[in-house]
Amino acid sequence: MSRTVIGVMGGSSADAHTLAGARELGRLIAERGWVLLSGGRPTGVMQASVSGAHEAGGLTVGVLFDDDRAQAAAGLDIVIPTGFGAGRNVINILASDVVVACRGNGGTLSEIALALRFGRPLVLLDFDPGRDFLDACSVEGSESQWAIAPDAASAVAQVSIYLAAMGR
């Protein structure tokens, strides 16, 4: 019988609260005998969750963005270099029995969408990917890149505002 794989997704940069939650999550996954799968980078939620699982004696797998094993998180037992860039997110989701998403940015949002698309059960750890998430995904230093419109007329009005800001 194959082992249960829990995919832990989240930002490459994160605040202390998110990192502590990811580390605790990794520990709890390991204590249950589940395999922790992550994006495998040595930063943010990926490193924190791997560290928690590794310290608890769990098995950890990292599916890397690039083909450089030197970019792997400390504590990974299995490193899978892909060279697929963001395409590796599909592998992360399909290889997971259940996906847990921690606070992140655009990559995490794509993993959430892929989990839903491929029918993987999804748990959001201590965040709501609404307004805060959209703000986090926006290009730093720019005006707001998103808006919520209650009706079609308001949507067109907001489009006009964006176009005017672009000089169009």
Feature-to-residue mapping (PLM):
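A charged, well-structured terminal subsegment
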Residues: 98-99, 146-168
